[in-house]
Amino acid sequence: MKFSTVILAAGKGTRMHSNMPKVLHTLAGKPMVKHVIDTCNNLGAQNIHLVYGHGGDQMQQALVNENVNWVLQAQQLGTGHAVDQASPHFQDDEKILVLYGDVPLISEDTIESLLEAQPTDGIALLTVVLEDPTGYGRIVRKRGPVVAIVEQKDASEEQKLIKEVNTGVLVATGRDLKRWLAGLNNNNAQGEYYLTDVIAAAHDEGRAVEAVHPSHSIEVEGVNDRIQLARLERAFQARQAKKLLEQGVMLRDPARFDLRGTLQCGSDVEIDVNVIIEGNVSIGNNVVIGAGSILKDCEIDDNTVIRPYSVIEGATVGENCTVGPFTRLRPGAELRDDAHVGNFVEMKNARLGEGSKANHLTYLGDAEIGKGVNVGAGVITCNYDGANKHKTVIGDDVFVGSDCQLVAPVTIGNGATIGAGTTLTKNVAEGELVITRAPERKIAGWQRPAKKK
């Protein structure tokens, strides 16, 4: 279905108490307006006209990769005025969908229903029935059909009793919308040009006005302050958690789980409390994710256990691995099958081979580590000389004792042993033992200093 979209995003958002434009505040790790843009793109919008005002530079920087038509509303004179700024770009025969950058949860299904309901010569608008309609424009009907929308400040006492309210979302053809926008005036309590007045204009011309309801009222809730944003965040996360539960993922507490990207899960996956998923994450079968872990843009293969409070970003973890607790895998880290990394181990741009282990207090950066390697506690690959990064290569079946510094570039051959406390600066051949230690001294009769009383 061919259509173009106008997204209104010019508001300052005073009640957010922020220097950032309201629509750039994030929901599930993504700016609110980006949720709306993504929904439009998923539905195949031909053009997206983004009406902006406050914080234009911040807006364009944050959305630099988005294919949108930037439309400036220099003065905020109402929703009708905002849409009118984009009207020169409307094609006469195309459907124009009006959305809002601070209403991030509107669904594709609801938009499709609205587009399908739009009469050829009329308007389709999205309405919702609220127990407390205070603050919303009321839907005025006459023997069934919608004839007008009256804003709260302009409503009579009788009209204020109406519970069906306007969401601001509507669809009309470009030709009609341009004509109706041109006829708007600001003779109202706010002194603004209301988009809602196009409903009365359509009715006066005898055009049909169809009302469509969203699947859930949360879809059309807007954000004016941080309390409302927090409410939508939890609603969004609850919806994501429900989908995962329906797919068979075991969330130990759905209320304490945050998905801020996309998650692909195999069967029998268990996710403990306070886990955060960001970016694109893939999890295989029979995987356990421990409490408080953060996974971002990573791949976890089958039968792997991620113990609590591990942070994995831009990394790949193979089958039957154990990670954590308190492990950090940074971009470029790779664990081959059956590898183990334990508490306070950090890896970046490094590969740990099949069956290899680094269980305690270790940094592995710019390293290639073979199969069956044991990396002792306190081992550091010294990969940076103050100007450039250098690589450490460790062969298969190597034993690296505790508290070693491997000063790159350095290569250790298969089966070699590096004694505890060694500072290694030269390559090691296969099977060699290398030890560098300060001479041990014993001082007989030494006594500790006594504490002063």
UniProtKB/Swiss-Prot annotation:
Active site residues per record: 360 (proton acceptor)
Leading EC class: transferase
Residues that coordinate or bind Mg(2+): 102, 224
Binding sites annotated in the UniProt record for UDP-N-acetyl-alpha-D-glucosamine: 8-11, 22, 73, 78-79, 100-102, 137, 151, 166, 224, 330, 348, 363, 374
The protein's required cofactors: Mg(2+)
Keywords: Acyltransferase, Cell shape, Cell wall biogenesis/degradation, Cytoplasm, Magnesium, Metal-binding, Multifunctional enzyme, Nucleotidyltransferase, Peptidoglycan synthesis, Repeat, Transferase
Segments for region (N-acetyltransferase): 248-453
UniProt similarity note: In the N-terminal section; belongs to the N-acetylglucosamine-1-phosphate uridyltransferase family. In the C-terminal section; belongs to the transferase hexapeptide repeat family.
Protein's recorded name: Bifunctional protein GlmU
Species for this entry: Vibrio cholerae serotype O1 (strain M66-2)
